[in-house]
């Protein structure tokens, strides 16, 4: 048995998410079927994590096992992209790995990126690829709020009601807030995240940036661990799984 890691880029707009669902088209199933077709054996793809419907990836990581060694990886990548590119999926690379490697369990850090377009007019080019916010946001307040999130905390406040994680305790390694002209980029780094955690944190930072909340209220919202008090989560369209570190 041989194991291969694949790095994947995709636009999640037209998919139900990464994971195979009973209804709708998933990214996982789309790639699995194409691999099965080309390699002429049933392939099961294991991702580093699930992305929800509408969420994109700059470099999702996954692995699959195959009986025989792939003779020409470059040819396989080209063939995969021939079928997948029209569906807004791109295979960046395929690498041979040992059988101890696991796309999810071997990950040391995950990086998510969230894009906000902060101007009066929405972007035509980045339609459904970023969150358009008309009201001018206070970047300094957002930066101060983001620093309060760094460290090991009980993130119950930002946890989806249907989150299946055993514990709400997570360690956020770092948060970066960068503005380029009218686009704001928020980057979050952690070994693992709770379901909807990033989108919920961005939604709360938006309230802070709009001055609907002051910094003290933002801190209290985190401490209270009450989902009813939290701001609405940011839309999926602005969220990107950026990179998996092993």
Q: What are these language model-derived features?
A:
Residues 1-246:
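Structured-RNA-binding interfaces characteristic of tRNA pseudouridine synthases
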């Amino acid at each position: 048995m041989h194991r291969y890691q694949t790095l994947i880029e995709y636009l999640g707009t037209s998919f139900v998410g990464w994971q195979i669902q009973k209804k709708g088209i998933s990214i996982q199933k789309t790639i699995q079927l194409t691999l099965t077709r080309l390699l002429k054996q049933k392939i099961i793809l294991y991702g580093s994590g699930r992305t929800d419907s509408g969420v994109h990836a700059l470099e999702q990581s996954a692995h699959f096992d195959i009986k025989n060694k792939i003779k020409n990886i470059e040819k396989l990548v080209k063939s995969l992209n021939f079928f997948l590119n029209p569906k807004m999926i791109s295979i960046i690379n395929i690498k041979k790995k040992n059988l101890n490697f696991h796309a999810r369990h071997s990950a040391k850090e995950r990086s998510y990126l969230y894009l906000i377009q902060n101007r009066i007019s929405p972007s035509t080019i980045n339609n459904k690829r970023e969150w358009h916010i008309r009201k001018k946001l206070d970047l300094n307040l957002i930066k101060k709020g983001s620093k309060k999130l760094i460290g090991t905390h009980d993130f119950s406040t930002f946890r989806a009601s249907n989150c299946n994680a055993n514990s709400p305790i997570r360690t956020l390694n770092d948060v970066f807030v960068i503005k380029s002209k009218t686009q704001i980029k928020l980057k979050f780094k952690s070994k693992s995240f709770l379901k909807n955690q990033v989108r919920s944190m961005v939604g709360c930072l938006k309230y802070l940036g709009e001055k609907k909340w002051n910094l003290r209220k933002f801190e209290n919202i985190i401490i209270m661990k009450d989902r009813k008090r939290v701001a609405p989560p940011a839309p999926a369209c602005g969220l990107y799984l950026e990179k998996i570190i092993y």
